[in-house]
């Protein structure tokens, strides 16, 4: 299959908008909802993976570490507010270290590096979409542009600069 190398903002603007069709749950403690989320994620063969950190807009501003760990299956997404949880619980670190569950994301190396600064785990079975698109001649690596080129949809990333702490 062949794809466009690049896409312009004007081309993206006319595409059909798209968003995650499943349920999204924000979790900030290790209660019943947390346990249900972990059980669901353990049953998945492939999950989506992303992290968010408090925005840093200048070099002199301190870096605060990962605030949010996002993991999703086909029909459910979980936003774990890891700062409020006192870090990443062991059960989530086990998922991140599992060879049995493929974790897919963009700029995965940076996200994993951010997690490893404060949490001990050995990341396994991660797939970085930004590294894969080069094989298809795609030069645009942002999630928004990859979605436009590969899926033909427009996605919004407006929430990515939110302060999840």
What role is predicted for each listed range?
Residues 21, 43, 66-68, 100:
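NAD-dependent ADP-ribosyltransferases
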Residues 44, 62, 104:
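Active-site acidic carboxylates
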Residues 4-19, 70, 75-82, 88, ...:
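Active-site-proximal helix-loop-helix substrate-binding element of RNase H-like nuclease domains
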Residues 30-31, 52-53, 83-87:
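Short beta->alpha connector loops
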Residues 1-47, 118, 129:
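N-terminal accessory regions of nucleic-acid-interacting proteins
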Residues 46-60:
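Short acidic, Gly/Ser-rich segments with clustered Asp/Glu that frequently serve as metal-coordination loops
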Residues 57-76:
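A short alpha/beta connector and helix-capping loop motif
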Residues 34-35, 55, 91:
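Eukaryotic intrinsically disordered and solvent-exposed regulatory patches
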